[in-house]
């Protein structure tokens, strides 16, 4: 069978093989005028961990559960070599689990929890290591922070770089960044069509087609259409929190496998969902209410969540020599979203006209223009090996939001896109210019020192009268010391920081506060076993955040906490244990605490665990090839309980019972899934069962404390695949 996932030299996912080759490292084209850099080929000693190589053959194997390459560190390299914790969700893993949305894929990431609604941030919204990631979503290394629900049909893998990463990506948080890696063209002609059906009206069709147009030119097209019902419904009118999504990803490359490569990418995604705001908390029990069954839905047949996303990119890669490359990306992105959701009611049952529950309405339009250019090179200086990176980035952001007008003059409610209240739109314009540089120095054999710095200048302006024009000029650093005693062992200690101004969140507060700062120290180890087929990692970290910003657009508070901390332990294993047995698993322990409360907040909140930060998370997915084309698999995703409360409250009596801190709490859970597959050269069939035991669990919480969203009930999905 011709593998649709064969890789090309400049792709973000090289082959499974681990053989010595030259890595390509990042400066911007705009900084290169009049500058030249000599690069000299170096032969790594046998004890130095070899960098990845790339197979250019049509039938190169795709990654299994272990990713062999990533560009999340701005350099195409094996995740094993990065002095920072990295989790990669591969395409194979997503296919085996029948993953459609980014949210479902990220269930494979330990230490990650899901937020619900967030007062307007009802798109993809997660916490990593207890810190929000709203401003840390990326697509091929470029910011993708708009509010929408992302899909995986056009993704090759998802890289999660843990810890502060502002030196590499710009303003951000302590938890880390989530970088989506898109599929790219290959040489050769091949394709795949997949169709899936399941209970609760699940229907999905995807297509992945690659066409060779010339010796160095190729086109790749990915398409998707999915419809889903739900196990939950409104008893008054039968409405369900439905999903209706369709998308297209197109990529054309010329100069493939040459020193001068140009790629054009275009991506569109349309969603027409009925949003789900879950179940209210009971003020007496501090748990999701039992007054209504967990399958009760407060939305109606008229509520909606419509979004249209469009992105066009040009990527130019030019090899200055065998040891130096410049890579430039230009992207225009447009995001349009409008929704009406009904938040649940603690005492009143759902109605057909929206008269019960609380309406959440908003229309947002965002337009981003990004230019990013990186120069990477390898050279020797004073007898030491250097891996150099330098870059420049310009980002222009333009966003507006408005509230919708209730068109029903009676007791019910009715909203429609484009029907606004008389209040003017709230707008945000921001211009960011950044310069960054990094050097990884092998100063003695097997020891490497990474030193990096970045400076961001942000000029932002709000239309809100009590929001001044904001100018921020901040620097970030990244350091790491690595020891490679063998080619398969890596021990490191790293330190990084990051910043995020109010402007980053579009929270529109008129208050004047210092920029949010995060500092992360991490001690880690990475091992490669089974001749490189199995990767293990362990990390101990401390993450501190000061002047933590509020991300809830419904709230007027700007600061959540003055200082908070998470101390954590992470363990992860990914890859092949035997030729037939693969595994992907992660375990996370988090000890989180509010060290200093927000100005004016209740002093009793100091020392408490922050919101939506479970003490423990665990995920496991494992498959075994039985022979004759048969494969079985299964796994579990588990989280301990998560708090939901307002940390800015001046009087937090509702969170204390007899002096004991007792906020609203989403209970811990464990969800078990299973898979059975039969694979042949040109076709395959797969049966997935999600939530085998049909447990009611709450996988997302609105961290202000209002409600929690139940996870999927038992889902049975049958998939057929044709490959040619």
Identify the role of each PLM range.
Residues 281-296, 347-355, 401-426, 550-561, ...:
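Surface-exposed loop/turn segments flanking beta-strands in extracellular/periplasmic regions
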Residues 255-259, 366, 385-387, 393-397, ...:
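Structural signature of Gram-negative outer-membrane beta-barrels, strongest in the C-terminal barrel
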Residues 190, 197-228, 232-274, 304-315:
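Transmembrane beta-barrel wall of Gram-negative outer-membrane proteins
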Residues 310-335, 357-463:
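Face-selective signature of the C-terminal outer-membrane beta-barrel domain
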Residues 542-544, 560-651, 693, 719-723:
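Gram-negative outer-membrane beta-barrel transporters
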Residues 49-188, 498, 523, 703:
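Acidic, small-polar-rich N-terminal luminal/periplasmic segments of exported/outer-membrane proteins
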Residues 628, 638-653, 677-724:
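C-terminal beta-signal and adjacent terminal beta-strands/loops
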Residues 313-331, 335-343, 484, 491-492, ...:
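Membrane-embedded beta-barrel scaffold of Gram-negative outer-membrane proteins
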């Amino acid at each position: 069978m011709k593998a649709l996932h064969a890789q090309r030299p400049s792709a973000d996912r090289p082959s499974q093989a681990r053989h010595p080759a030259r890595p390509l490292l990042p400066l911007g084209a705009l900084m290169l005028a009049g500058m030249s850099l000599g690069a000299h080929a170096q032969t790594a000693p046998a004890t130095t961990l070899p960098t990845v190589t790339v197979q250019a053959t049509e039938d190169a194997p795709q990654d299994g559960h272990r990713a062999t390459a990533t560009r999340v560190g701005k350099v195409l390299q094996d995740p094993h070599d990065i002095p920072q914790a990295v989790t990669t969700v591969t395409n194979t893993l997503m296919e085996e689990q029948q993953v459609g949305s980014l949210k479902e894929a990220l269930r494979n990431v330990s230490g990650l929890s899901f937020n619900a609604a967030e007062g307007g941030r009802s798109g993809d919204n997660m916490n990593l290591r207890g810190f929000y990631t709203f401003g840390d979503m990326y697509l091929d290394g470029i910011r993708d922070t708009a509010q929408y629900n992302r899909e995986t049909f056009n993704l090759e893998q998802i890289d999660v770089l843990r810890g502060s990463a502002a030196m590499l990506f710009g303003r951000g948080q302590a938890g880390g960044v989530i970088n989506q890696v898109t599929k790219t063209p290959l040489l050769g002609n091949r394709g795949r069509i997949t169709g899936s059906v399941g209970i609760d009206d699940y229907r999905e069709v995807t297509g992945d087609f690659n066409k060779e147009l010339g010796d160095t030119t190729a086109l790749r097209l990915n398409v998707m259409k999915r419809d889903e019902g739900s196990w939950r419904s409104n008893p008054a009118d039968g409405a369900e929190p439905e999903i209706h999504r369709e998308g297209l990803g197109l990529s054309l490359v010329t100069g493939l496998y040459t020193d001068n490569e140009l790629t054009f990418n275009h991506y569109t995604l349309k969603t027409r969902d009925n949003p789900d705001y879950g179940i209210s908390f009971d003020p007496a029990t501090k748990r999701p209410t039992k007054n209504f069954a967990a399958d009760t839905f407060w939305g109606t047949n008229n509520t909606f969540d419509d979004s249209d996303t469009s992105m066009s990119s040009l990527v130019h890669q030019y090899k200055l020599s065998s040891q130096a490359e410049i890579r430039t990306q230009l992207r225009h992105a447009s995001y349009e979203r409008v929704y009406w959701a009904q938040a649940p009611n603690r005492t009143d049952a759902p109605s057909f006209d929206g008269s019960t529950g609380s309406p959440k309405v908003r229309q947002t339009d965002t337009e981003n223009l990004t230019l990013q250019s990186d120069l990477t090179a390898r050279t020797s200086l004073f007898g030491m090996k250097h891996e150099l990176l330098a870059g420049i980035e310009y980002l222009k952001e333009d966003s507006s939001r408005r509230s919708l007008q209730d068109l029903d003059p009676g007791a019910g409610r009715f909203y429609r896109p484009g029907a606004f209240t008389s209040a003017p739109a709230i707008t945000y314009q921001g211009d960011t210019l950044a310069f960054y540089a990094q050097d990884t120095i092998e100063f003695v054999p097997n020891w490497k020192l990474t030193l990096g710095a970045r400076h961001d200048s942000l000029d932002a302006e709000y239309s809100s009268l009590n929001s001044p024009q904001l100018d921020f000029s901040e620097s970030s650093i990244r350091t790491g010391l690595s020891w490679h005693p063998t080619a398969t062992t890596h021990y490191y200690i790293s330190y990084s920081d990051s910043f995020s101004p109010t402007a980053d969140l579009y929270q529109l507060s008129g208050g004047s506060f210092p920029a949010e700062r995060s500092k992360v120290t991490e001690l880690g180890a990475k091992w490669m076993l089974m001749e490189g087929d199995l990767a293990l990692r362990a990390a101990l970290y401390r993450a501190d955040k000061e002047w933590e910003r509020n991300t809830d657009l419904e709230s007027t508070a700007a600061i959540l906490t003055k200082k908070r901390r998470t101390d954590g332990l992470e363990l992860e294993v990914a890859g092949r244990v035997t030729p037939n047995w693969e595994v992907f698993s992660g375990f996370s322990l988090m000890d989180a605490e509010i060290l200093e409360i927000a100005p004016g907040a209740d002093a009793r909140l100091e020392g408490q665990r922050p919101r939506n930060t479970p003490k423990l998370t665990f995920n496991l997915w494992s498959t075994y090839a039985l022979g004759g084309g048969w494969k079985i698999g299964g796994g579990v995703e588990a989280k301990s309980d998560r708090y939901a409360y307002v940390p800015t409250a001046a009087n937090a009596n509702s969170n204390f019972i007899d002096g004991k801190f007792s906020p609203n709490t989403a209970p811990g859970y464990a969800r078990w899934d299973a898979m059975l597959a039969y694979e042949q050269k040109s076709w395959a069939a797969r049966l997935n069962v999600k939530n085998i035991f049909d447990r009611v669990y709450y996988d997302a919480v609105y961290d202000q404390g209002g409600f929690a969203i139940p996870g999927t009930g038992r889902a049975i999905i049958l998939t057929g695949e044709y490959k040619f």
